[in-house]
């Protein structure tokens, strides 16, 4: 890309391609969001109950909670360690990876549960992730001192396999999502089934439209943002001023940085903000 400026900051992405006309005359902007409903791991999540280890969670965005039980789940995220290093974590996506799960009642014990409304048949507090059932073995001294041996086994696994201490959960951002790749759906392969199409399908097309644009008359911009699922709040949501700041930085790099020109550039811009819509389903 000629004369391009891109910036990625964790959960947002902004890319500009300077046009032939001055930035003050406005931009053509493509926008989409890259967050999706999910389950987040809390900051002090690991606990043991009845010889089973769990991760305490809360859900992000609008989810049908009953859809998340008894399906293979993967964990994605980052851990910021005490020494300042940041480690990416993905467990559950490779064929030989273990997956996680949220348990549910078997049908023979569900008489009262199935009488509940769909919104409460699985409570938000019941979305904790089952991560282990085997107690720690091979350490006689620790086995005598430790009352929660399954939790201790998980802590040992984290240390040996991820070089992670239990305290590192405090500075971690870990997300639970359905495990598995997107796949063709239907005998005619006319559909795609996969997690996160709202709204990454629009983010994908917006990004590639930007990458395939050459020598635009007006400055082109692609902005992919976070927090849409919870109202666009926070430092990386559209309620913040980060986009205006990026435009001001670009104006300072290419022209004189006059604040009035920044406001003119925004006022003269056009934006296509894209998101998914619901398909017609005759069954409903």
Where are these regions (language model features)?
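Metal-dependent peptidase/peptidase-like ectodomains
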Residues: 113-155, 231-284
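Single conserved hydrophobic/aromatic residue that forms the stacking wall/gate
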Residues: 1-5, 9
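A generic, well-ordered mixed alpha/beta core segment in the N-terminal half of proteins
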Residues: 22-113, 118, 129
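Alpha-helical metal-binding/catalytic segments enriched in His/Glu/Asp
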Residues: 32, 55-60, 193-233, 245-246
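Short glycine-aspartate micro-motif
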Residues: 27-31, 222, 269-273
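Soluble metallo-hydrolase cores and metallopeptidase-like ectodomains found primarily
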Residues: 10-15, 20-24, 93-194, 212
């Amino acid at each position: 890309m000629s004369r391009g400026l891109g910036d990625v900051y964790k959960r947002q992405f902004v890319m500009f391609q300077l046009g032939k006309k001055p930035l003050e005359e406005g931009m053509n902007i493509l926008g989409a969001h890259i967050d999706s409903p999910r389950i987040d791991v809390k900051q002090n999540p690991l606990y043991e109950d009845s010889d089973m280890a769990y991760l305490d969670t809360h859900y992000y965005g609008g989810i049908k909670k009953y859809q998340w039980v008894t399906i293979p789940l993967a964990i994605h995220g980052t851990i910021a360690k005490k020494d300042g290093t940041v480690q990416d974590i993905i467990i559950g996506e490779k064929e030989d990876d273990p997956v996680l799960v949220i348990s549910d009642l078997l049908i023979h014990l569900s008489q009262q549960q199935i009488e509940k409304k769909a919104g409460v048949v699985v409570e938000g507090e019941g979305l904790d992730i089952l991560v282990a059932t085997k107690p720690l073995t091979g350490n006689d001294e620790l086995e005598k001192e430790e009352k929660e041996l399954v939790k201790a086994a998980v802590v040992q696994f984290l240390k040996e396999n991820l070089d992670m201490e239990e305290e590192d959960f405090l500075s971690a951002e870990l997300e639970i999502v359905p495990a598995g790749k997107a796949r063709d759906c239907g005998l005619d392969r006319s559909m795609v089934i996969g997690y996160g199409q709202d709204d990454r399908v629009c983010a994908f097309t917006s990004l590639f439209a930007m990458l395939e644009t050459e020598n635009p008359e007006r400055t082109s911009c692609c902005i992919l943002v976070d927090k849409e699922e919870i109202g666009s709040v926070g430092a990386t949501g559209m309620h913040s001023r980060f986009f205006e700041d990026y435009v001001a930085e670009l104006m300072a790099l290419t022209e004189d940085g006059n604040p009035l020109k920044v406001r003119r550039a925004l006022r003269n811009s056009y934006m296509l903000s894209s998101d998914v819509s619901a398909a017609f389903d005759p069954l409903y």
